[in-house]
Amino acid sequence: MDLTCFDLQQSMEFALKYLIEMNGERYVTTHDLNAQLNKIDKMNIHDPVLEKVRLKSYVYNSWETESRYKDSFMPLAADVEEAISVCKELILFVESNTNQKAELNKLTAF
């Protein structure tokens, strides 16, 4: 379960950073999901899934270190199941948002 939680946090973090970079900005150099979400807010990108990540970011952020270094780490199964769903939804949103940008870039390249 430890590795699952770590991988979920990392997947969300990398998806947010990818979204930022693919929209022409530099991501914040931290593992904090809220820092990336704040940057995305400033970029005027909004979606309900981003709010889902924000609502549980205190849980997901803790997984980045606690899952690897805290022997007593024991996540709630409901949190893990919800995180899997949110992570999938986030990745789909990021793919959709960045694919639209890529298509727009192709159209304006000429």
Q: Where would I find each of the regions flagged by the language model?
A:
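Terminal alpha-helical segments
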Residues: 1-110
